[in-house]
Amino acid sequence: MSSTPNPKAFPLADAALTQQILDVVQQASNMRQLKKGANEATKTLNRGISEFIIMAADCEPIEILLHLPLLCEDKNVPYVFVPSRVALGRACGVSRPVIAASITTNDASAIKSQIYAVKDKIETLLI
């Protein structure tokens, strides 16, 4: 396992944004607004129910999730890489590493404002 993130992992969140993203992921997991794994993230994008996509930059090989940024750009959904798949797995509430996760849409959600705040920050990274 390498300590340097893959250069293909762009945009990579800084430490503060990573913490904020993982906090929202944890809350979304409790609210049943989270899909874990590259396959489920792909399904949410195809169904049009994804707010944003989080991917792990230390995924090995990184190519197994590089179809997601292309799909995100087609569907106009923001995406971001976080440095650690283990931290993403913990935030998702599972004991295994998670390489991709999707926050899903729910207008009646209690954490809607936090989701939109993080979504805006991710969108500024993509510009």
From Swiss-Prot:
Pfam families on file: Ribosomal_L7Ae
Protein localization: Nucleus, Nucleolus
Any one of the GO BP annotations: mRNA splicing, via spliceosome
Keyword annotations from UniProtKB, A to Z: mRNA processing, mRNA splicing, Nucleus, Ribonucleoprotein, Ribosome biogenesis, RNA-binding, rRNA processing, Spliceosome
Domain of life of the native organism: Eukaryota
SUPFAM superfamilies (alphabetical): L30e-like
A Gene Ontology term for the protein's cellular component: box C/D methylation guide snoRNP complex
Main subcellular localisation: nucleus
Keyword Ribonucleoprotein: yes
GO MF terms held by the record: RNA binding
Its job: Common component of the spliceosome and rRNA processing machinery. In association with the spliceosomal U4/U6.U5 tri-snRNP particle, required for splicing of pre-mRNA. In association with box C/D snoRNPs, required for processing of pre-ribosomal RNA (rRNA) and site-specific 2'-O-methylation of substrate RNAs. Essential for the accumulation and stability of U4 snRNA, U6 snRNA, and box C/D snoRNAs.
Record family assignment: Belongs to the eukaryotic ribosomal protein eL8 family.
Subunit structure: Component of the U3 snoRNP particle. Binds to the C'/D and B/C motifs in U3 snoRNA. Component of the 25S U4/U6.U5 tri-snRNP particle, a subcomplex of the spliceosome. Binds to the 5' stem-loop of U4 snRNA.
Protein name as annotated: 13 kDa ribonucleoprotein-associated protein
Organism: Eremothecium gossypii (strain ATCC 10895 / CBS 109.51 / FGSC 9923 / NRRL Y-1056) (Yeast)
Gene name, Swiss-Prot/TrEMBL: SNU13
